[in-house]
Amino acid sequence: MAKQKKHPQGNIAQNKKALHDYFIEQKFEAGLALSGWEVKSLRAGKAQLVDSYVLLKDGEAWLMGSHITPLKTASTHVIADPTRTRKLLLHKRELGRLFGSVQQKGYACVALSLYWKKHLIKCEIALAKGKKEYDKRDTEKARDSDREIQRAIRSKGKED
């Protein structure tokens, strides 16, 4: 009997900038329509989601601005475009919810992460509302105070 291959686990890429620039309202899991060389590159971890977003048009969702670097060995016979638009696979009711929400002022749809789910590559997208500059400062202050509290707790535990 053939040995079963282990499925890769975990995150491939994250968009930390989106977490900094937006309030995340709702998250969705979407499949990706990829070509073979893209899957091989993602297996090697060669992807970036910084400045990527989701474009909703004609009843479909498209991932724009993501960068998947082609491997030199995998894409020899194909002209690989690292920043091509990739189709996101969502259910109709999820697409309807996204379309309705994005029509409201201030809402956007952004990609948060790419990850493996068994042998499939999934993209976590979010319905998000843009942060103002003062919101970003408030978030940073709260994060700093949490760090100080954790540091104090750790140092108190070491003294005992």
Swiss-Prot record:
Glycoprotein: is it a keyword of this entry?
A: no
Keywords on this record?
A: Cytoplasm, RNA-binding
Q: Does the keyword Cytoplasm apply?
A: yes
Q: What Pfam families does the annotation carry?
A: SmpB
Q: Which InterPro entries does this one have? A: SmpB (IPR023620), SsrA-bd_prot (IPR000037), SsrA-bd_prot_CS (IPR020081)
Q: Where is region (Disordered) located?
A: 131-160
Instruction: Tell me where it resides.
Output: Cytoplasm
Might you name a Gene Ontology BP term for this protein?
trans-translation
Q: Which GO terms describe its molecular function?
A: RNA binding
Summary of the function given for this chain in its UniProt record: Required for rescue of stalled ribosomes mediated by trans-translation. Binds to transfer-messenger RNA (tmRNA), required for stable association of tmRNA with ribosomes. tmRNA and SmpB together mimic tRNA shape, replacing the anticodon stem-loop with SmpB. tmRNA is encoded by the ssrA gene; the 2 termini fold to resemble tRNA(Ala) and it encodes a 'tag peptide', a short internal open reading frame. During trans-translation Ala-aminoacylated tmRNA acts like a tRNA, entering the A-site of stalled ribosomes, displacing the stalled mRNA.
Q: NCBIfam families, per this entry?
A: PRK05422.1, smpB
Q: What is this protein called?
A: SsrA-binding protein
According to its UniProt entry, this protein's organism is Azotobacter vinelandii (strain DJ / ATCC BAA-1303)
In the record, what lineage is assigned to the organism producing the protein? Answer: Bacteria, Pseudomonadati, Pseudomonadota, Gammaproteobacteria, Pseudomonadales
